[in-house]
Curated annotation (Swiss-Prot):
This is PAXIP1-associated glutamate-rich protein 1. Component of the KMT2 family MLL2/MLL3 complex, at least composed of the histone methyltransferases KMT2D and/or KMT2C, the common subunits ASH2L, RBBP5, WDR5 and DPY30, and the complex type-specific subunits PAXIP1/PTIP, PAGR1, NCOA6 and KDM6A; PAXIP1 is required for the association with the MLL2/MLL3 complex. Forms a constitutive complex with PAXIP1/PTIP independently of the MLL2/MLL3 complex. Interacts with NCOA1, ESR1, NR3C1, AR. Residues 160-253 are annotated as: Sufficient for interaction with ESR1. Keywords: DNA damage, DNA recombination, DNA repair, Nucleus, Phosphoprotein, Transcription, Transcription regulation. The gene is Pagr1. Residues 115-159 are annotated as: Sufficient for interaction with NCOA1. It is found in: Nucleus. InterPro entries: PA1. GO terms for cellular component: histone methyltransferase complex; MLL3/4 complex; nucleus.
Amino acid sequence: MSLALGHGTIAGSTAAPLSEEGEVTSGLQALAVEDTGGPSVSASKAEEEGKGSQEEAGREASRAEEALEASSAVSDERAEGESEDWCVPCSDEEVELPANGQSWMPPPSEIQRLYELLATQGTLELQAEILPRRPPTPEAQSEEERSDEEPEAKEEEEEKPHMPTEFDFDDEPVTPKDSLIDRRRTPGSSARSQKREARLDKVLSDMKRHKKLEEQILRTGRDLFSLDSEGPSPASPPLRSSGNSLFPRQRKY
């Protein structure tokens, strides 16, 4: 009985450390799992970062390619523009070159003949068509010449005599100049035979004179242009004009 109990106690004592060892092993396994999980998470993060960096690098590469394409297009356009702007024409020799590409050369017999002519005559006759000459192009007037001509034209205009017109008038009648008198009349004819012209200054002066005469008649009661050459006697009464007519008798002007 004691052995059994003792054996049981031994088994119980041995079972207790086994259970503790299991807990320890399970704890170690859990730690191992945690340890193994840590590097996997970091590796996944590293992979994601690597993928992101690769994508960014790809984007930068695509941007660089686009920039290169744009610069190449601009350079091509500049080259095309320069090719259109700059044009170097070929020389006459290049235009006149034959199909074989060799320049023109006279035959040896012609060269010999020309040298013989030079030796005998000393000069060669120029065989060329002389074109007719045209007159030289007149030079354009400069600003100084134009400015010199303008004062002369103004002086000529100022020197021209002023011709009277119907609208040129003064307060007093203007006596006609000798240049305006008609000289085609005969010596025996009177001055009244001249053609009379209506002028505005003459009309205005006549109106002014008539107005003065009417004022004089109304103020004094006498007509200055009476038919009688003798003056009125002091005993005779002054002439009065009626209300209907201001001029009772005809006047001579």
